[in-house]
Amino acid sequence: MAKTPDGVSLKSDLTGDVAVVTGATRGIGAEIAAALGELGATVYAGARDPDDVTAPDQHALQMDVTDDGEVREAIDRIEREQGSLDVVVNNAGVFPRSGPLHEMDLSDFDRTMAVNLRGPVAVTKHALPLLLEGTGSRVVTLSSGLGRFTDGGMDGGYPAYRLSKVGVGGLTAYLDAEYGDQGLVANAVSPGWVRTEMGGDDAPRSPSKGAETPVWLARFAPGSPSGRLWKDHERISW
């Protein structure tokens, strides 16, 4: 196993690992799913419409992360077909544009929390029994620089999105504290401003660039750092 400058131990490939990626049909999620497959993982690509999953080497998985029944059935299917699960990438997200809190529509808040925070909670909850059967299973959850509450970075609107990503930080810290001694490696990642349907055409990063650090985190070997926020292969403050 190679050593990174951060002292993180990386798996050289993911052969034999089973991974599920939510929101895997476009943008960063599609790039993550493709890269995990190239590393040898068996990839389940979660989507609200499984017909949108076109990669022949991926298993299309119906999974609206706001539908608890679909999430449960998706994880049950992975268990039936594979008997194990090693990597969960919580990527599905929404980004409603809004001004400051007093201008926000509460329906936007509810929808954003349902997808961006409750979704990762539900997926991880149902996946945990399988994840904990292995050694060093990984949970990677997409966060954002807009959810960092240090360095005076919480102004500028988008309250629903910002608060949902603050919650992702709490989820990540909780998973490490609660399950880290059982071998779970849980981290969050800021992919940067990426040219996607959410990020818009003016964003400086390509989806493949945005996927690099999430895929890197999915390669973390047992005992690697957990409960942290990362960007560009480096730890950053919450």
Predicted regions mapped to residue ranges:
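N-terminal Rossmann NAD(P)H-binding glycine-rich loop of SDR-like oxidoreductase domains
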Residues: 25, 33
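Rossmann-fold cofactor-recognition segment
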Residues: 57-69
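Active-site Tyr-X3-Lys motif and surrounding loop/helix of classical short-chain dehydrogenase/reductase
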Residues: 73-80, 99-114
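Hydrophobic positions on the long internal alpha-helix
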Residues: 89, 123-127, 131, 171-172, ...
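Conserved NAD(P)H cofactor-binding loop of Rossmann-fold oxidoreductase domains
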Residues: 91-98
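Catalytic loop of short-chain dehydrogenase/reductase
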Residues: 94, 106, 110-113, 132-181
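C-terminal helical subdomain
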Residues: 181, 188-189, 200-238
